[in-house]
Amino acid sequence: MARVTVQDAVEKIGNRFDLILTAARRARQLQLHTREPLVAEEGDKPTVIALREIEEGLINNQIMDQQEKFDAIVQEVAEKEAISFLADVQANS
């Protein structure tokens, strides 16, 4: 089990309040399994993993925003392809 010093994570994010928001957001992703951890889990809870990722500079709000934008684009493309496929199937029926 890794020890996390919050001060190191605060230095990466800027202030404690943003750290709390960022860590909570990342921990939620890990808890819901919408994202894989970027560090070894080592039996740690999602909140500790999130803090370790932040401390190592692997995660911040900008990175998570970019990931979510990418996911939204991928989902939109998949939905358009599905609609196109269904329209083709219906037209050929």
UniProtKB/Swiss-Prot annotation:
Catalytic activity: RNA(n) + a ribonucleoside 5'-triphosphate = RNA(n+1) + diphosphate
Sample GO molecular function, one term: DNA binding
Main enzyme class: transferase
InterPro entries: DNA-dir_RNA_pol_omega (IPR003716), Pol_omega/Rpo6/RPB6 (IPR006110), RPB6/omega-like_sf (IPR036161)
A GO cellular component annotation in the UniProt record: DNA-directed RNA polymerase complex
Pfam annotation, one family: RNA_pol_Rpb6
PANTHER family recorded: DNA-DIRECTED RNA POLYMERASE SUBUNIT OMEGA (PTHR34476:SF1)
Protein name: DNA-directed RNA polymerase subunit omega
Organism: Glaesserella parasuis serovar 5 (strain SH0165)
